[in-house]
Amino acid sequence: MTTFESNVNIDNEQKVADAIQNQVGNSIKVSESLDFDYYIDRVLFENDGIVAWIEIKCTDTYEYCMSSYYKISLKKIKRGIDWGESTSAPFYLAVNFKDGIFITRITKECMKNYPIGWGGRKVRRVKGDQEPMIAIPISEFVSLRNFTIDKVYY
């Protein structure tokens, strides 16, 4: 499998996954990294049921309040929402900023209010690093310390 993440990226993501695991408790488990085809990093599960999908991002450049928005690939967010809707489980974005881990739930409804533009990495590694981006208001994130999972069962 081709990977676009360095060992440092993988280690940082695992640290965030471990912090999420500590926050949600023992009955809910954080999965190992999902295959690249999912476009989303992890699921949270309880017994055999998926209770949430989660995308994890890490930045060592920005502090939480440095900008009004956190920008991320529109395709990645759409995929997370699609997985969430198809499994009746919420989709979350967790970002490890320089000053802490913050998390937000993203739905199709709230996404309609987010600005969409063009952006991405300034130094291209592969074709497609510049792409449609969605800007999620920082005000919608909460500190992981204050996070509780919205478990939805059908």
Residue ranges of each PLM-predicted region?
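Acidic-basic catalytic patches of nuclease active cores, encompassing PD-(D/E)XK
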Residues: 1-34
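Non-catalytic C-terminal interaction segments of nucleic acid-processing enzymes
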Residues: 2-4, 18, 22, 45-48, ...
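Active-site metal-binding core of divalent-cation-utilizing nuclease and nuclease-like domains
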Residues: 26-48
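Short connector loops at helix/strand junctions that flank enzyme active sites
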Residues: 37-39, 49-53, 86-88
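Conserved catalytic cores of phosphodiester-cleaving nucleases, focusing on short active-site segments
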Residues: 42-44, 49-63
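Short His-Asn-centered micro-motif
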Residues: 32-33, 56-57, 94-97
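Mid-chain, well-packed structural core segment of small domains
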Residues: 82-94, 98
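Short beta-strand-loop-alpha-helix junction that forms the active-site gateway
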Residues: 56-77
